């Protein structure tokens, strides 16, 4: 089992962890319907960048 040679100070420990933070996912609002969705993903009703790309089940 590995054993540290010297204790890492709280400051150095914090600097080591500085890149471990999680980012908030990018949320976009569809301009035509006003629904929110993840960026670069279609909205739940099948609209992407103002265009209907998937047919709704009620329309099919």
From Swiss-Prot:
Residues 9-19 have a biased composition (Basic residues). One of its GO terms (molecular function) is structural constituent of ribosome. The keyword Transmembrane helix does not apply. Transmembrane segments: none annotated. GO terms for cellular component: large ribosomal subunit. Keywords: Ribonucleoprotein, Ribosomal protein. Pfam families: Ribosomal_L32p. NCBIfam families: rpmF_bact (TIGR01031). The gene is rpmF. This is Large ribosomal subunit protein bL32. GO terms for biological process: translation. InterPro entries: Ribosomal_bL32, Ribosomal_bL32_bact, Ribosomal_zn-bd. Residues 1-60 are annotated as: Disordered. Belongs to the bacterial ribosomal protein bL32 family.
């Amino acid at each position: 089992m590995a054993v540290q040679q010297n204790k890492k100070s709280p400051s150095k420990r914090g600097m080591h962890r500085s890149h471990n933070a999680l980012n908030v996912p990018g949320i976009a609002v569809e301009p035509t319907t006003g629904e929110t969705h993840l960026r670069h993903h279609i909205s739940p009703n099948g609209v992407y960048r103002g265009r209907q790309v998937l047919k709704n089940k009620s329309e099919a």
